[in-house]
From Swiss-Prot:
Homology family: Belongs to the RecO family.
GO biological process, one term: double-strand break repair
PANTHER family assigned: DNA REPAIR PROTEIN RECO (PTHR33991:SF1)
Organism, as annotated: Stutzerimonas stutzeri (strain A1501)
Protein task: Involved in DNA repair and RecF pathway recombination.
SUPFAM superfamilies: ArfGap/RecO-like zinc finger, Nucleic acid-binding proteins
Name by which UniProt lists this protein: DNA repair protein RecO
TM segment ranges: none
Designated gene of the protein: recO
Length: 236
């Protein structure tokens, strides 16, 4: 929900930053008020060292246009040190937020989910359930969510049937095999987040890719490509 802007102190995380004019930086922030873009002046100073992802910040922004000015920025807690696959997973979440969240569209519940996900990544908990939960929450917050236990006709999902995803509508039963289908047992497992069911986690990854694809505009995710390149690179 887009909310009227008022200058205030609020928690924030840096999603992305880049140099902007002389010694300034252009920063994309994620806050309870949504994704905000701001100019950080004197970005090479002490405060500028905080302009990096996964650091819990307290920020004061000023300005009425979509491009704000950082009036104050300080650490609000320890940084979440992500490495390896957890680092690429964090980059993936940040890229999803940049690509999909409209500017200044408040999603406080999504922000809290992000806050809870970062330490879980830093603790090297299983990545796939964390990523699927965040993707699902993001889709739901943006109004693109759909039921996993009921099809688009309002009928309960049948564990013995096959279904296809109709983007932004829901799951539709199909007769006969075709690429990209999901079996009902997998869908019911997803609805309960029961990842012990064989194939459920892999099916959830396919489902989220299909659900997100129409909203990414056909452009590949850089974080996903970097991760795939890392996996494919030869090792000594």
């Amino acid at each position: 929900m887009r909310t009227p802007w008022a200058a205030m102190h609020q928690p924030a995380f840096v999603l992305h930053s880049r140099p902007y004019k002389e010694s300034s930086a252009l920063v994309d922030l994620f806050t309870p008020q949504g994704r905000l873009r701001a100019v950080m002046r004197a970005a090479r100073g002490k405060a500028g060292s905080l302009i990096r992802p996964f650091v819990s910040l307290e920020v004061e922004l000023r300005g009425k246009s979509e491009l704000k000015t950082v009036a104050r920025l300080e650490s609000a807690g320890p940084a979440h040190w992500l490495d390896g696959q957890a680092l690429f997973s964090g980059m993936y979440l940040n890229e999803l937020l940049i690509r999909l969240l409209p500017a200044e569209d408040a999603h406080p519940a999504l922000f809290e989910h992000y806050v809870a996900t970062l330490p879980a990544l830093a603790e090297h908990r299983p990545l796939e359930p964390l990523l699927r939960a965040f993707e699902w929450r993001l889709l739901d917050e943006l109004g693109y969510g759909f039921a996993l236990d009921i099809d688009i006709a309002g009928q309960p999902i049948d564990a013995q049937r096959l279904y296809r995803l109709v983007p932004d509508a829901g799951l539709e039963p199909v007769v006969g095999f075709q690429p990209g289908l999901f079996n009902g047992a997998e869908l019911l497992a997803m609805a309960e987040a029961d990842w012990q069911v064989p194939g459920a986690l892999a099916a959830a990854k396919r489902l989220m890719r299909q659900a997100l694809a129409p909203h990414l505009g056909g452009r590949p995710l850089v974080s996903r490509e970097l991760f795939m390149n890392l996996k494919e690179s030869p090792r000594d």
